[in-house]
Amino acid sequence: MSPKRDGLGTGDGLHSQVLQEQVSTGDNLHECDSQGPSKDTLVREGKTYKCKECGSVFNKNSLLVRHQQIHTGVKPYECQECGKAFPEKVDFVRPMRIHTGEKPCKCVECGKVFNRRSHLLCYRQIHTGEKPYECSECGKTFSYHSVFIQHRVTHTGEKLFGCKECGKTFYYNSSLTRHMKIHTGEKPCKCSECGKTFTYRSVFFRHSMTHTAGKPYECKECGKGFYYSYSLTRHTRSHTGEKPYECLEHRKDFGYHSAFAQQSKIHSGGKNL
C-alpha cells in the first residue's frame, strides 16, 4: 500500500493554492471555498483560517488544507490491497491494519489486542466497571456512548429512517443500510475458508468460528458453549432466575428481551417498539 501524492506536500499542489491570501482592512481571516481559494475568497485574521464552504475555523493552514479535501473530494491515499482511497493519511493507515492483521493496542488487564486505540479504551470499561453515560429519563447507566444513544430512542419511540422498498422503519440509519442488503441481495462478507458469502458481518463472524476453535464461552453450571459472551450472559439467567425486563402494564418480569418485546407489542396494538 502506498499513498498517491497528487502534489500534496509540495509548493505546486493544493497546499500552495490555499496559501494565497488577501489582506483586508478589517479583521483578517482566511476563507476558502470548495473550488479552491482565490484572491476574492481568502481573507486573513492573524493565525485563524476559515473555510468559506462550511464555516469551520482552524489555527493552521495545514489543517485548512486537509479539511478542504472533504469539499473537493480529493483522496490522495489509496490502498493497493482493496483500492479504497482516503483523504487523510491517518485514515489511510487505520484500514491497512485490516489487511495486515496488525493489532498494536493491547489491554494490560487481559492481554486482548485491538487495531485501534479507541476500541481498546472502550473495551477497558469492562474491567473498570465505569458507566459514564446516564439516561436522564430512567437513570440507567451505560459504558458505551453508542449503546446509550440507542437506549434513549426507546423513550421517544421515534423511527426516522424508512425503507423505500417495503416501508419498514428504523431508529438508526445504520440499521436501514443493513436492512437494504435484503433487497439488493448484496453479500459482501466472504469466508476465505469455504467461499460462502454472507449479507451481515455478524453472521459471517459466527460462521468463521465453525472453522476455528468453536465456542469460546462456556457455562460453568452446565458446560454449554456459546459463540458470544452476551449469549452466555442470557443463558446464565436460566440458572439464576434473573428477569431484568419488566412489563409495566402487568408488572410481569422477563428473562429475555425478545419475550419482553413481544409482550410490549401486544400492549401497543401490534406496533413495534
From Swiss-Prot:
SMART domains: ZnF_C2H2. The keyword Nucleus applies. It is found in: Nucleus. Coiled coil: none annotated. It comes from the Eukaryota. GO terms for cellular component: nucleus. GO terms for molecular function: DNA-binding transcription factor activity, RNA polymerase II-specific; RNA polymerase II transcription regulatory region sequence-specific DNA binding; zinc ion binding. One of its GO terms (biological process) is regulation of transcription by RNA polymerase II. A zinc finger (C2H2-type) spans 49-71, 77-99, 105-127, 133-155, 161-183, 189-211, 217-239. Keywords: DNA-binding, Metal-binding, Nucleus, Repeat, Transcription, Transcription regulation, Zinc, Zinc-finger. Its main location: nucleus. May be involved in transcriptional regulation. Belongs to the krueppel C2H2-type zinc-finger protein family. This is Zinc finger protein 80.
